[in-house]
Amino acid sequence: MTPETIVNLQKHPIEDLNYTKHCKAKLDLNGALVMENFLTDESLDYLQYESRELRNLAYFCHQDHNVYLLEPDPDLPDEHIRNLAQTSDKGCVTHDQIPVNSPLRTLYEWPRFRGFLEAVLANSIFPYT
């Protein structure tokens, strides 16, 4: 798969400057950016299959924390977001375990996608080694 067949560029023209500005404005306003149907159906189906195949290589982690990943603050009310615990369960597969021809690796290494993320986040992005 090529980057152009992985990303739904009809709905998410990440190389369009106006679209990028719109995404940044939504992120700045809401604190989150939801990009529904960002991946094409074909690439999403394949990535789900691939993740099931790689599951045995994943490192799994369970954590209880607040949204800030900080210790609770006794000076704030109990119902303050800083003092509300949530649970995270995740499984991570290291970069070197992801097949070279994986759509995930293709997207991760695509310079135009990285440029879009850097513009929206207003920050540099560096790949893991």
Residue ranges and their predicted role:
Residues 39, 46-58, 76-129:
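Signature of the catalytic double-stranded beta-helix
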Residues 1-80:
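N-terminal auxiliary "cap/dimerization" subdomain that precedes the catalytic jelly-roll/cupin core
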